[in-house]
Amino acid sequence: MAYTQTATTSALLDTVRGNNSLVNDLAKRRLYDTAVEEFNARDRRPKVNFSKVISEEQTLIATRAYPEFQITFYNTQNAVHSLAGGLRSLELEYLMMQIPYGSLTYDIGGNFASHLFKGRAYVHCCMPNLDVRDIMRHEGQKDSIELYLSRLERGGKTVPNFQKEAFDRYAEIPEDAVCHNTFQTCEHQPMQQSGRVYAIALHSIYDIPADEFGAALLRKNVHTCYAAFHFSENLLLEDSYVNLDEINACFSRDGDKLTFSFASESTLNYCHSYSNILKYVCKTYFPASNREVYMKEFLVTRVNTWFCKFSRIDTFLLYKGVAHKSVDSEQFYTAMEDAWHYKKTLAMCNSERILLEDSSSVNYWFPKMRDMVIVPLFDISLETSKRTRKEVLVSKDFVFTVLNHIRTYQAKALTYANVLSFVESIRSRVIINGVTARSEWDVDKSLLQSLSMTFYLHTKLAVLKDDLLISKFSLGSKTVCQHVWDEISLAFGNAFPSVKERLLNRKLIRVAGDALEIRVPDLYVTFHDRLVTEYKASVDMPALDIRKKMEETEVMYNALSELSVLRESDKFDVDVFSQMCQSLEVDPMTAAKVIVAVMSNESGLTLTFERPTEANVALALQDQEKASEGALVVTSREVEEPSMKGSMARGELQLAGLAGDHPESSYSRNEEIESLEQFHMATADSLIRKQMSSIVYTGPIKVQQMKNFIDSLVASLSAAVSNLVKILKDTAAIDLETRQKFGVLDVASRKWLIKPTAKSHAWGVVETHARKYHVALLEYDEQGVVTCDDWRRVAVSSESVVYSDMAKLRTLRRLLRNGEPHVSSAKVVLVDGVPGCGKTKEILSRVNFDEDLILVPGKQAAEMIRRRANSSGIIVATKDNVKTVDSFMMNFGKSTRCQFKRLFIDEGLMLHTGCVNFLVAMSLCEIAYVYGDTQQIPYINRVSGFPYPAHFAKLEVDEVETRRTTLRCPADVTHYLNRRYEGFVMSTSSVKKSVSQEMVGGAAVINPISKPLHGKILTFTQSDKEALLSRGYSDVHTVHEVQGETYSDVSLVRLTPTPVSIIAGDSPHVLVALSRHTCSLKYYTVVMDPLVSIIRDLEKLSSYLLDMYKVDAGTQXQLQIDSVFKGSNLFVAAPKTGDISDMQFYYDKCLPGNSTMMNNFDAVTMRLTDISLNVKDCILDMSKSVAAPKDQIKPLTPMVRTAAEMPRQTGLLENLVAMIKRNFNAPELSGIIDIENTASLVVDKFFDSYLLKEKRKPNKNVSLFSRESLNRWLEKQEQVTIGQLADFDFVDLPAVDQYRHMIKAQPKQKLDTSIQTEYPALQTIVYHSKKINAIFGPLFSELTRQLLDSVDSSRFLFFTRKTPAQIEDFFGDLDSHVPMDVLELDISKYDKSQNEFHCAVEYEIWRRLGFEDFLGEVWKQGHRKTTLKDYTAGIKTCIWYQRKSGDVTTFIGNTVIIAACLASMLPMEKIIKGAFCGDDSLLYFPKGCEFPDVQHSANLMWNFEAKLFKKQYGYFCGRYVIHHDRGCIVYYDPLKLISKLGAKHIKDWEHLEEFRRSLCDVAVSLNNCAYYTQLDDAVREVHKTAPPGSFVYKSLVKFLSDKVLFRSLFIDGSSC
């Protein structure tokens, strides 16, 4: 132990001394990486060459003043005023950076040669020749152009491409590039210029009269003018000479003449008007007309150059409230003089105007006046007796040092000579030991004598003042003034005979105060400017013509009367109905009668839309002759189909019942298909159909069900073939999960490009050398698949359902008679039995195997029945009388027996109703018994997007028999069954209590070692099943997979903490889960849910009730009280009460146990202990496994204890864990999807649901790359981003499939108790480089803007840059008296669940909005197979698809995906309100709307682990949406707010104050306590244990509103 301690101490000392090589290497690597990043950042800035020779100090001045540029100093050109001349090019580039590239720009007095060299063909220079020097300067610019062209010619080069347009413009039309008129008289006329016009003025506004400047800008329609000029604040002090030290220049003023020159050089001077420059400096408003004015704003001062901009302002846009009636004084006097015979009141009326006023003030800071005082100096001429006085600025410290020192002199020593000697001594330098010690004060030596005189007089007067105070203002016969002048005369003698008179006249000495004044100057001087303009514009609101609308309403009246018999007629969309009838020329009364018949299922036809809406019915009733191409035509006539043999010869195969160019009723099913070989080499296009949802079914309901079943087989086959064709087209873009299901064979090399997991596939899709695609039935020999010469590749699928679909289609098509299925006249009996009632046992007891037939859905069930039937040793059940449904249909007609007396179908309700009807007809039976359970899981449509109307799901039967005695279920489960079934359910089981539940702390607790599970393991979701299998559990199935099975003991597990829609009180999945066991069931769950409540209720049952099997529940009624207030939100100020303990108590009640977790060192523990991780393919740089040590500042310690964690340090282990839990943990739930066609259908629903009808088609006249769109994007960007865009050469695109990976240092707090058992992974950020964002950012910004402008904002809110107040306004018109269903779709792992289908949907939306095809393809390739690199942690990996969290489309892409997902699953035409934000959604539907199985649809189509949750109040983006009688109020989640108060990353008190302000902004609505009761109900919906919380809401308001009190929530961590 001692040796270990010694070794540790020695290693630590070596590290401190720098002897640890590993630490030194890491530090060097970190230093190197930092240097590389810094240099790369500098390289992205615009480059400017500085050729003039300047000093090192001047180099530093230029670099610091213009950090936006990467300046290269060559020092190759000696010139006069080198720094100022070189800075002029920087100033020009800085001004041009403010202007959008390509916008028409006027350069006032500019250098046209500079613009030519930069290739700016959009700049026009106004260069008037105001003097000879201007002519010389213009000729010099021409010389520079000639010199440049001669160099190119000498080198055999041509003008570069970026300069060619500008040089061509100057060569062909030189007056377009430059003119020699003043800007006020410029005659340049732009040709076809669109967009805004800009101007720049670089050191040229001196010569433009300020009063003409605004009108000149307006004449050229200039939107903004940017200007730069030399100036100094000291010119405002009326100094006659001012130095500009940085550029070694100076201003000198003589009256109104202001001269600018460079010091230490023999150069020409520049003369300007001082008063004119002063107007530019001090004025704010520059009127241009009686309506418009240009407003000046200073931007920045750099190296003695002032930058400002002049913005064009339309005064008519001022709010009319600033207008007031006032009298124009000049107009008043004019009216009085010209019209004395009028009354005075008439003159007043003539002069009265409606005026708009505005004012501004500008402060000028005089930095050189800091610590300075103004000292008066005076002098007199002995010859002329002319008196002069001036004031100088002298160091305050110098003045009072002198005054304090000489004040100590005795009366005899206080002489002018002594004072001058002392002042000279402290100003002079001293040499000590050969080293010069300079004076502390740099005072001009020429002023020392005058200053000494002032100091002397000031001190003399101070002495006399002291004597006066001592003598109580009485000094004898002489007055104080006389004493003063006696002393002065004695001191000076006859040298200054008129000193007294001079001092009095100049007020140097104030006799009344007996003091000499030394003033302290103001550091700021304020200049005011005022704008007064006359209000002239007046616009009247046009009247609305409603006569046409009223006439249309009268026409629709009779039709609406017919529709009033519908159950939900009050929700009928009259506008849509009338528009559709008018555009399609459908009679409204006819359409109304058909709608009533269709909605009542009495029409004899079915429109397989999601809902038979008004618009779809009108479309179906459209006249056949006027139907557009592809529209539906309802006809009863038979159309002959060409011979099947002829179709096969052409490689085409017509599928039955699939909508396309022909309606379903026009098909005449051919009976020539005898075997599956006739499918061989059918073209893939003939099997792929798109418009599956536009089929019209006619005939009796059984016939319609049978047609729908045929179409479902075709749709399944179509989707599978489409996916195989897609794989053949793009083999390289297949992700790892897809590779496990499919295979691709290269015929030429006889090698599998993608090796399938299974072998001997019966079918596949063939790609020929002509790039044609055919379905082929495969054969095998010794070498593998038998191929043809024209075959290029073969794609196969491991899913055998396609082969069975082909076989079943072949059989069913043979059964059709004239295109119509035959309906059997056999009696159909439904045996509805409760779970465990012995349905299989009853079948075996009733069946006669010699003449009856048993059909079951699965192979295992068929083998089980045969085994039980033959258990006596006598073989009675064979494959001829006990079959699976698929086997019977595929091999129909091949067995010896074709007719059966009775048909028994086990679990028949799990089959498609049309399939059941076919089975009855094919068996030729007399009576059919269909055994099933109406309350258990029904048939699930596995083909995403295929229509299966609700009334098709009801099996048409002649008789229903019930079985209400369960042989399996214990008594407590039987008690639950009585709630679900009509009639009394009895049980024969001797077990009374069998169910129990256990709340586990988190998903990590469930593992085979610490939590072995007893019996059969079941889960609700596939993701939970996969999680258990990955942890080592075996024989795990979902509830749906074991329906009909029986087990002695069951362990039911739920690992998903988010709501699951199938776990509900009336869910069939819950019923199946509770009824699988005979002895015991234990439910392990991480969250409270309805099943826990059910089990707890069953655990409390008494033996008496279990013996009775009886449920007696009363009807609950709710008292309703009408609202008292109407209108807007009632506001009641919340009292500021409570203490810290209130917040702690509330948090502990809502999340018990979280505050007791000691998690400050969890990250350290994970790094120091052994850990085992399962990762996908990646590359790890183990040299990054030990992070470089950093000096960490101890943060403030919170007083409120929450589950918040300390900030993590990024490193290989942390980043890898985050990547495993995020990017490597994507679910796989989706079924068979025809990706391209289904995506197209989904996008159709998206546009129909959310976009206004008139904006559903993109505006082709608007370019996404317009100047306006670029301007809008640039306004949102920082200067650094714009600089990177300017540095990018645009020659080629960067690698769009390369991403960087990083993690957020602060873990995200969860509002649950999972922190007690899990180590939360950090959030990952996957992002592109800035160059890619700069390319696609403006593009997607414009696409987003177009999308949001097209959304129906009255019903839908896409939450982008919205405030809580805007959310309240959106939901404010909800009527609380109307019953509503509040729905939330909760999705786990939203970003990582997105796969190829999501990308296809999103790209299709962007494409329809106008996304250019080439860039769209580039963007698509960059989001398929992508490479992630984490340089900090040393990790590199590859992922497929997934949403990139740092992408330019992350937020809007997630928003449109969630909206598209909901539009594909829910009836959006009935929605009241809907809001979407990222993965959050909130929907308001009328009460009682029917919704599909959202989890099923989300799993199969969207790969989402989604749950549709019904609530009383909405929860959206961390806020509770409380709708009430007066409108809506949005409260920030108080529990989330308290959780943030436990933050452990607050650095210091300043950071804490910023944190408080941010919390105040989001929690401002808590100041209103009027709706605290509703907030309590909303919180209790989410957190069941939450107490009434008004006390804690008030406490939050109290602490957040007081910055001092808020500091008490934290203590200094360094003092702990």
Curated annotation (Swiss-Prot):
Residue ranges annotated for the Alphavirus-like MT domain, each copy included: 72-281
All copies of domain RdRp catalytic, residue ranges: 1380-1493
Highest taxon, organism lineage: Viruses
Catalytic activity: RNA(n) + a ribonucleoside 5'-triphosphate = RNA(n+1) + diphosphate; ATP + H2O = ADP + phosphate + H(+)
One record GO biological process: DNA-templated transcription
Recorded GO MF terms: ATP binding; ATP hydrolysis activity; mRNA methyltransferase activity; RNA binding; RNA helicase activity; RNA-directed RNA polymerase activity
EC number: 2.1.1.-, 2.7.7.-, 2.7.7.48, 3.6.4.13
Stretches assigned to the (+)RNA virus helicase C-terminal domain: 964-1116
Stored CDD domains: Virgaviridae_RdRp
UniProt keyword list: ATP-binding, Helicase, Host-virus interaction, Hydrolase, Inhibition of host innate immune response by virus, Nucleotide-binding, Nucleotidyltransferase, RNA suppression of termination, RNA-directed RNA polymerase, Suppressor of RNA silencing, Transferase, Viral immunoevasion, Viral RNA replication
Entry keyword Metal-binding: no
Keyword check for Ubl conjugation: no
Region ranges (Helicase): 830-1085
Record region (Methyltransferase): 50-458
Residues reported in the UniProt entry to bind ATP: 833-840
InterPro entries named among the record's database cross-references: (+)RNA_virus_helicase_core_dom (IPR027351), Alphavirus-like_MT_dom (IPR002588), DNA/RNA_pol_sf (IPR043502), P-loop_NTPase (IPR027417), RNA-dep_RNA_pol_alsuvir (IPR001788), RNA-dir_pol_PSvirus (IPR007094), ToMV_Hel_N (IPR049329), Virgaviridae_RdRp (IPR047310)
Extra remark: This protein is translated as a fusion protein by episodic readthrough of a termination codon. When readthrough of the amber terminator codon TAG occurs between the codons for Gln-1116 and Gln-1118, this results in the addition of the RdRp region to the replicase.
Quaternary structure note: Heterodimer of a large and a small subunit.
Similarity remark: Belongs to the ssRNA positive-strand viruses RNA-directed RNA polymerase family.
This protein's name: Replicase large subunit
Protein species of origin: Tobacco mosaic virus (strain OM) (TMV)
